[in-house]
Design a protein with these regions (language model features):
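Conserved N-terminal phosphate-binding loop of PLP-dependent enzymes in the Aspartate aminotransferase
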Residues: 1-392
Length: 392
């Protein structure tokens, strides 16, 4: 253990020197098939040549300039996002946590400007994850996140996942918004059915409150659409974005309709690094690659191949696996063995997966993973399951 680093992570005894596509390599040259992609961050794999070119080209011109000035790369990326989404405007951050913070501020400022400052309560859901800031952990509400950190930021109402009647019963004169992940990632790859998201949109319209979706993990092509909420045909008022949009470079965003963002005027929010030229140059290239029908269709095709293979593994190893969850390339395997045992045994088979709540192992590969790599991943997952069976 490196004692000079704050021990907030229970790190695996692995260190990587370089990456290429869906592979990570140690200094000894050992290759690991990365089915986690930095927890849905490396949307186009490691060291993608087009992203490297976008980054290095910009690095040779300008790294940072304050948001006191116009930033052409930021303006271009914002235009791309507005042109292809529900949003009318964008604010750039460096992470999903920062995006959550702004979404909370935006919701509350919206009501303050309407003369209804008492409307501060945001409905959130059990199993959710919205980052590790004070607002983020208060929004999620899990004791695992909040224990020991003193009084929580008030104004969050935590409800059971996808219980329409409970949600409507909780809406009152203090309710400002509903905040939800279309697919819970940390919560165990729990997919909100399309009809439920439609129902939330209807509830928000009925009671004149805002709908905010957290697409930090499930957005940027991961489900076969640019954003997961698109499958339901609804438009949120606010969306939080990060992870895949930067392809591995720190970048996040909050997308908003004009009405929802109406309270965010000069001086109400800011970011030193948010929307810097380096990050936005990479983000532009990510969107240009991912947001095409051909690319998004390929995600759906690859999802079908992985899912078919996983179903075969469940049939063959019913003592190890219980069910498959998710959609696109945001998949989860609920295990019967401890999920951490599976992840750790995977290290021995040189495959990287990601644990989640509810004893789930996440598969979040690069969106451009090849068919050959999918077959190799399924083989290594089977080897892992077989080793755990033998060890029983």
């Amino acid at each position: 253990m490196n004692t000079s680093i704050l021990p907030t992570y229970n790190r695996a005894p692995l260190a990587f020197e370089r990456g290429e596509g869906s592979w990570l390599f140690t200094k000894n040259g050992d290759g690991y098939l990365d089915m986690g992609a930095g927890i849905a961050v490396n949307a186009l794999g490691h060291s993608n040549s087009e992203l490297v070119e976008a980054l290095t080209s910009q690095a040779n011109k300008l790294w940072h300039v304050s948001n006191l000035y116009e930033i052409p790369e930021q303006q271009r990326l914002a235009e791309l996002m507005v042109d292809t989404t529900f949003a009318d405007s964008v604010f750039f951050t460096n992470s999903g946590t920062e995006s959550c913070e702004l979404a909370v501020k935006m919701v509350r400022k919206f009501w303050h400007e309407k003369g209804q400052g008492e409307r501060v309560e945001i409905i959130t859901f059990d199993g959710s994850f919205h980052g590790r800031s004070s607002a983020g952990i208060a929004a999620a509400g899990s004791e695992k996140l909040t224990k020991g950190f003193g009084p929580m930021l008030p104004g969050f109402v935590h409800l059971p996942w996808s219980n329409h009647d409970a949600i409507e019963a909780a809406i009152n004169e203090k309710t400002a918004a509903i905040l939800i992940e279309p697919i819970q990632g940390e919560g165990g790859i729990r997919l909100l059915p399309d009809q439920c998201l439609k129902g939330l949109r209807d509830l928000c319209d009925k009671h004149d409150i805002l709908l905010a979706v957290d697409e930090v993990q499930c957005g940027i092509g991961r489900t076969g659409r640019l954003f997961a909420h698109e499958w339901s045909g609804i438009e949120p008022d606010i969306a939080m974005v990060a992870k895949g949009i930067g392809g591995g470079f720190p970048l996040g965003a909050v997308l908003a309709k004009t009405s929802a963002a109406s309270g965010m005027t000069a001086g109400t929010h800011g970011s030193t690094y948010g929307g810097n030229p380096l990050a936005c140059s990479v983000g532009i290239k990510v969107l240009e690659i991912v947001n095409t029908p051909e690319f998004l269709n390929s995600v759906t095709k690859k999802s079908g191949l992985i899912t078919q293979g996983l179903l075969g593994l469940i049939d063959k190893y019913p003592d190890i696996f219980e069910e498959i969850r998710g959609t696109g390339l945001m998949l989860g395997i609920k295990c019967k063995c401890p999920n951490l045992d599976f992840v750790q045994e995977g290290y021995e088979k040189a495959i990287l997966t990601v644990p989640a709540s509810d004893n789930v192992v996440r598969l979040l590969p690069a969106l451009n993973i090849t068919i050959e790599e999918i077959n190799e991943a399924l083989s290594r997952l089977e080897q892992t399951a077989n080793s755990l069976r033998i060890a029983k």
